[in-house]
Amino acid sequence: MKRIAILFFLFNTVIIFAQQQVTGVVKDNTGTPLPGVNIVEKGTNNGVSTDIDGSYKITVKEGASLIFTYVGYNSVTRLANASQIDVALSEEGGQNLDEVVVTGSRTAQRSNTTTPLPIDVISSKDLTSTGQATFDKALQYKIPSFNTVQTPVNDATSLLDPYEIRNLGPSRTLILINGKRKNLSSLLYVQTSPGRGETGADISAIPTDAIERVEILRDGASAQYGSDAIAGVMNIILKKNYTDGSITVRSGITSEGDGEMLGVSLNNGTTVGEKGFLNYTIDFSKVNLANRPGNVDAQGEADDFLDGSPAAVATVNEFLSRHPDARNINGSPETAAAKFLINGGSPISDNTNLYYNAAYVYKKVNSFANFRTPYWRPLSGDPYLNDLFGNGNDANPSYDGYGPTFEGDLSDYNGTLGFKSVKNGWNTDASVTVGGNKQTYTVNNSVNRSSILDADGNETYRENSPISFKPGGTSFNHVVGNIDISKILSDQISIGFGTEFRSEYFTVMEGDQASWDGAGADSFAGNLPENSGKWNRYNVGVYLDVAFDITKDFLINGAVRHEEYSDFGGATVWKASTRYKFLDDKITLRGSVSTGFRAPTLHQIYTQKSQYSFVPGEGIQVSGIINNVSPQARKLGVSQLQPEKSTSVTVGFGAKPFKNFNITVDYYNIKIEDRVTLGDRQYEVIPATDPAEQDEIIGEVAYFSNAFDSRTSGLDVVTGYNNIGIGEGKLGFNLSGNITFQNERISAIKNNSSFSDILNSLTFTSRPKTKWILGINYEIGKFGFSLNNTYFGESTFNQDGLASNEVRDADGKLVRIPGSTETERDDSANLKTEFLAKIVTDLGVNFNATEKLTIALNVNNLFNILPEWKFVAENEAGAALLADPAAVKTQSNLITFNQRYSRMTYDGSHFSQLGTTFNLSVNYKF
């Protein structure tokens, strides 16, 4: 026993003397302390971060090396051969693949090269260099797998542009702020635009100047983070600096002289107590309307709204001679925004830190519906319009149409309060997060055309209609509680586990009566009382994450998670990943396989935008969207919504064959089962069960369902070669791309769903199958130059029955639609539209006038490249149509609303239709 005790003592003595404690301070090359610098013992998971004063303390093995990394700075490696090691980091060289990332693992932090998952890291400098006005648009020109688009005349969609990663819609990317879940928007996209039927967080609300970096995990991560992480995770890391600040004044204008932009942003920091910090950002911006209408085709208008005769064309031409664009306003809306954000933290003991962040955003957007021309509803048919809209002229002195406006007020807030502590090597993080989004709407210059009589027999609307309406709105709120615990058990094993509780609330606010009564406000009817209400649910999740470094080169990682929802039950998902390095870490092989889930949002379950009306002889008719829990949905055979389930596989490699050069290539394959989809509007009739009752007619309605299974596969490529000495300056190249191999439905349509060619296009084919970004930057002296080229590949859009065939009976006669003079047409499409591949070039020049003053000029879309599409024949009948100019014009009128949207159809595009824009900013540091 005595010998064992002696051996035990000697063993522990060796361990103690084989380790050493290293302390120091990390500063930048101006001598300013840097908080949050990552220090990792090379070849291990052992790491710490610098405190508010740039100081650190770490225990490492004797003879170890320390790697110091910070976003936007060169990484530095130092041999731990002293008890105090002070380090100065230089901004030259910017980010690299050795940056430590916090996304993708619930155990130890790892660098980009040691993580088994594909992660993009975008610094604040990268974002601002794009010259884009908002965070989401900056990502569009930095991340090939990220797409966002602005669509014209789309009501509430104008408040929040849809975005997506890997063409999987906004609902399947989880947004985090400092690692905590951000609230969803209250907006449900219901228009014919990308993202239809989905919702996502409002990332455009986050001020760019508040962001230190963005980590984008391009891999399924439901096992670590829960619902919504099927396509990936975007973690927005906020700035922590407190010793300096800056103010930026931004201005911009398009090459056509509209869309004027003016903004000012302040980012600053201060100390709180001895070692606490507070960083804050205040941002105000105003963007004016930019209008890109087309010249309207008179014959198409006469055919659609009149009888198509020469007299009808003359009537239309009288108006178009004065207003060739039919007074339509479509482009980018008028927007004003105010954004406030804070991020802070303070130590409350030797091993416990308090942290917090909060943000509030207010945004007002003013857009327009299609202009109601006088020949749409002639004064002879509705004489009251002259009293409401007396805007005539000499040729038509009484009435000249009206243009409804759509005005939206959006507010978004989020906040987190938490504690992090370290005790006996156990890291504990406990937090509470709240967040919400509210949108209310106003419709002006419109009318309720319904013939509804009051008790005295007078018209309630029509000639007595108001011209301003409050259609109501929506709100979404959540409360999230998290407890995350992790520990590095040894040089080889680290674990993480935790729990999350989340409560969600969705509200549909009733509009004023005039906005919904009868047909409601023209252009945008309000929320009916029976469609309004408040709904909520809660869920609890637990997870376990284990990482095992079998050797310093070979890592395996596994995670499992179970969530229980109050409305649909439980879901269990898992993930396994691995990474292997060789050739002195020059080559890294990595891969992962995982299952995931996405719970249908409360918006998708409970949204109902329907109009009920009685039609003599036909009973009650319902049109619009019926919600998933309505009796009508059950009668139509629509099942209760269930979570989407996914299986994701990613395989790739990274290489650093020589200094300053890196490349990563990752293949992904994502299968989604029971995809939640908003189907097409369709005409439905529910037979009455009682012969004494009338059938219930479910008119032009759409509804959500688990409609089909899908598969998306592709390749992500990221490469960079930086710090190349050219003369007295430094040159850098970055090339990244996303190639989609497969993005399609792989099952039959389920649950009595309707899924047309249009929906198939919006879901699968209307986004670029290929997107590449080539960036070149050169810095010399006080000047910096950047040239960014973004290649948007081809995409296609199939309209339902575009140039379809007329239906004939057995005798070869044309079949008429009952009660109409129109001819029935089949569902075939002889033509489709194809958006042509385009390269958009952005040029940036910045001048460091002094150490504190920087002037930057960005010319976005330098060569004024505009979206362009063409017809493509699907068959011989389509080819014959393309040979007939008159037929081509007719079909073109169908998808551009008689050329109103000649630049950008309702089908969407992939970059701005505004053309060249000029942006000038002045930044002053203090």
List PLM regions with ranges.
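C-terminal beta-signal and adjacent terminal beta-strands/loops
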Residues: 7, 185, 788-818, 847-926
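Short, acidic, small-residue-rich periplasmic hinge/interaction motif at the N-terminus
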Residues: 27-32, 37-42, 65-74, 82-128, ...
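Short acidic/polar hinge/loop motifs at secondary-structure boundaries
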Residues: 56-58, 180-218
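Extracytoplasmic beta-strand/coil segments of soluble accessory domains associated
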Residues: 57-59, 140-185
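N-terminal periplasmic accessory domains that precede
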Residues: 83-90, 137-138, 142, 163, ...
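Transmembrane beta-barrel wall of Gram-negative outer-membrane proteins
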Residues: 243, 256-369, 374-381, 385-386, ...
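Outer-membrane beta-barrel transmembrane domain signature of Gram-negative proteins
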Residues: 394-396, 402-417, 421, 434, ...
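Gram-negative outer-membrane beta-barrel transporters
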Residues: 662, 667-801, 925
